[in-house]
Amino acid sequence: HEVVGVTMRLWGGESDTGCCSVSDVDDARRVAQQLGIDHLVFNFSDDFNKHVVDPYVQAHVDGLTPNPCIECNRHLKFDRLSERARLLGFDAVATGHHARIEKDDEGTLRLARGADDAKDQSYVVHMLDQNELEFTMFPVGHLTKAQVRDRAVELGLRTATKPDSQDVCFISKTGGRETFLGNRIPFRPARVVNEDGSEAGSVEALELVTIGQRKGLGLPGGGPKQYVVDVDTPNARITVGDESKLFCQSVVVNDIVWSSETDVERLRVNNDVLVQSSAHGVALPATVEVLTESEIRLNWLVPQRRIAPGQSVVLYNVTNSYVLAGGIACSDSEKVSLS
């Protein structure tokens, strides 16, 4: 392949997370020079604010727990960047994600897990459909992270020992999420109540609270551990309970993106799947009810901790080798108590 290096300029502010800073652009340019290839910089900062930063802020206002890195992949890397690449006449976009693209016996392209289990990123690129998979390459997906670094050392690349990027690029390690959101929205105080409605505590920022949270709730010390089991955003009320109240039997997931249209009908017949709800979480067994082509209900084989509304939920085949679909958790269909 004839290769051209590309860096997307996304976040205009400072970044100390190892991604999207001015120094990262400079690193990419210098690596391209070492490799003897051209290097382009595309300024997608307006798109990044529109599709990633602004929705991230609004999600917190709405009481959701968003995943901005997934939205960046959805709207920037595999939409705007691919669109620009096609306009410039390129045959494919290659990224450094630890995932693989394989073809099954029926000729369907499959987004498979990366060879390095600890670094697998199929969860964060789950939104790729057949057209996007056809235009995408993951050249390091068959390698471990250690092998990638070894190869970079062999080539003498200046970034060979550069630390992995961490966390959300526009949230600084020093200021954190509280400072970022506090500069953009007014925080709302909220009551913290027990399940019987009695007062338990209070918080100064409802927007910073998520399902399963245990600290920062203004609760008296010395008692049993209490967790956030419900966030009532319109009424500015947070309900806490013991850990058993966090478990549910099922969850509704909407905004579903199918890897292949054939998977919709297959899951109506054979509905066993494995489900992952965080970037490095364990895939857990469930069955699927296809409610519409864009909404499903997942029924856990064993009750599981609730998935915070707004989080991405990804379905894998029963051997846990490739992605079937993914969407956004919107509600618990049936809560259970383990007590």
Go through the PLM ranges and name each one.
Residues 1-126, 137, 145-147, 228, ...:
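ATP-dependent adenylation/nucleotidyltransferase module used to activate substrates
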